[in-house]
């Protein structure tokens, strides 16, 4: 489900089936250590749906996507409240881009100078000073118009970072406020609001592997992902949306704080990488993309594609084929068996610092 959903969302965002297909295969391979029969698997699917709803709403402004976001928030709070706060993190890059665009459109300094000139004209009694200030005022107004034109020109033809002022983001802010109260729609009280804070304040942050900081030297594949982003952004003239840049920077920071967030880097930032590669391919290799798509739709192309999918599946599955369902070296199996066989489970309380 996650793989199919990632491909469909990636294809919709980058508008390139070939790029979406190849990056989805790569993402599935990189996610092999994070896929387990845990609530996080459902969370990954919900995060992908969140990105899909946000992007679709910003494009077509249909309110049904806002309802979908509220539903996702309720499900997350009930299924995996530990990651529920991250649901709001996914909104922040879009909100930040909108705020920056609004501030840029204000031209605060020039407008402040215009207001200052008007105040001077009102209080000056000397006609000569008034005329001189009126001339300055007209110059400031012309400067304001030029500044507005320069801003529009820069947005139409940006150098590296694209900034879009989408008024639909106001609705996303409203949905964020509404969703902040959906944490109460659970049978566990205020736990969705306090669980993450209590976990981060506990001593497990220094002992549980997935909570430890990321070390790139020990994680070559994650290093390769970062290198791909840097190579495209530095050595090509491919432009990146400001919201995507914020998302990439924020999740990268989270990865270095805790290695468990690498999964979110692969999933969420995978969409950003797909858009960058699609732009790159569209600009430099449009004809080759068409040829490859035509080749993939032939019988031989379909067989090769199927073989590639099966090969990656075997590579992911083979190391785990001989493993027991429960790894006794990683989980306290004997302790759990002892508790079940010798203690009154229904009337006992076990202290677990992690929970």
PLM-predicted stretches and their roles:
Residues 286-343, 355:
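Membrane-proximal, lumen/periplasm-facing interface regions of secretory-pathway glyco-
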Residues 34-42:
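Short acidic/glycine- and proline-prone juxtamembrane loop motifs at membrane-interface regions
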Residues 85, 89, 251-289:
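Hydrophobic/aromatic-rich transmembrane helices and adjacent perimembrane loops
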Residues 56-74, 110, 170-174, 242-249:
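Short hydrophobic alpha-helices at membrane interfaces in multi-pass membrane enzymes
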Residues 5-8, 27-30, 42-60, 91-103:
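Specific aromatic-rich, kink-prone transmembrane helix
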Residues 3-29:
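Transmembrane-helix signature of polytopic, membrane-embedded enzymes
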Residues 38, 81-132, 136-139, 143, ...:
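Transmembrane catalytic cores of multi-pass membrane glycosyltransferases
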Residues 27-31, 66-81, 178-182, 249-255:
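Membrane-interface alpha helices of multi-pass inner-membrane proteins
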């Amino acid at each position: 489900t996650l793989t199919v959903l990632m491909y469909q969302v990636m294809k919709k965002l980058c508008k390139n089936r070939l790029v979406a297909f190849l990056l989805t295969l790569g993402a599935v391979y990189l996610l092999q250590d994070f896929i387990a029969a845990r609530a996080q698997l459902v969370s990954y699917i919900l995060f992908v749906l969140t990105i899909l709803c946000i992007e679709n709403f910003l494009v077509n402004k249909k309110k049904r996507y806002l309802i979908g976001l509220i539903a996702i928030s309720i499900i997350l709070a009930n299924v995996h409240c530990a990651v529920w706060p991250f649901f709001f993190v996914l909104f922040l890059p879009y909100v930040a881009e909108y705020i920056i665009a609004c501030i840029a459109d204000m031209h605060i300094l020039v407008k402040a100078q215009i207001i200052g000139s008007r105040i001077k004209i009102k209080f000056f009694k000397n006609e000569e000073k008034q005329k001189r200030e009126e001339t300055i005022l007209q110059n400031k107004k012309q400067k304001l118009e030029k500044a507005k034109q320069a801003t529009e020109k820069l947005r139409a033809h940006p150098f590296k970072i694209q900034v879009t002022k989408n008024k639909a983001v106001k609705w996303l802010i409203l949905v964020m406020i509404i969703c902040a109260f959906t944490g109460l729609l659970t049978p566990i009280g205020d736990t969705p609001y306090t669980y993450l804070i209590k976990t981060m304040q506990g001593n497990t942050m220094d002992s549980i592997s997935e909570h430890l900081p990321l070390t790139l030297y020990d994680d070559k594949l994650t290093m390769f992902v970062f290198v791909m982003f840097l190579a495209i952004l530095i050595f090509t003239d491919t432009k990146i949306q400001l919201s995507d840049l914020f998302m990439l920077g924020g999740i990268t920071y989270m990865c270095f704080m805790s290695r468990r967030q690498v999964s979110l880097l692969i999933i969420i930032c995978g969409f950003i990488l797909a858009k960058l590669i699609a732009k790159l391919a569209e600009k430099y290799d449009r004809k080759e993309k068409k040829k490859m798509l035509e080749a993939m739709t032939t019988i031989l192309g379909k067989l090769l594609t199927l073989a590639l999918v099966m090969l990656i599946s075997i590579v992911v599955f083979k190391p785990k084929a001989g493993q027991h369902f429960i790894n006794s070296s990683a989980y306290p199996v004997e302790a759990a068996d002892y508790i079940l066989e010798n203690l009154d489970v229904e009337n006992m309380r076990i202290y677990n610092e992690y929970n």
